[in-house]
Amino acid sequence: DIIVDDASLDVPAAWTRIEKNNGYGRSYLVLNPTSEKQTLRYPFEVKSDGKYEIYTYFIRRGESSKMTELVVSDGNEQKGVVLNADEIEVLGQTSGEWVSLGEYNLQSGKPGYVEFTNNGTITGQICADAVLLVRK
């Protein structure tokens, strides 16, 4: 498995790091509502070719947007994914849950990424925490 956590990223100025233990790891990132397009990229590279399921750790906050827009790149193509907060069930006493972004054929030497974006239209906060790749 490969995990890319927010702690390993160069964070754009519009995003705020929240130092709390209610996400994956010790922190997560928040983007407040803005009309300016903002993105945050979680880059990854696999060491062996194969099919991988990609997840993100979804954090539910009272101020969160109902929709979170992402772009997943397998190193060749990009695919848009929209997470609807109303369709994600957070179980137990956590404030988040691993949510699948789909299965992708990934190749060694072809870096990919998961990118969070607001497209300048989101009305609530966007939370970004971690990305997980699990080989199938």
Write out the residue ranges for each language-model feature.
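Extracytoplasmic
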Residues: 1-136
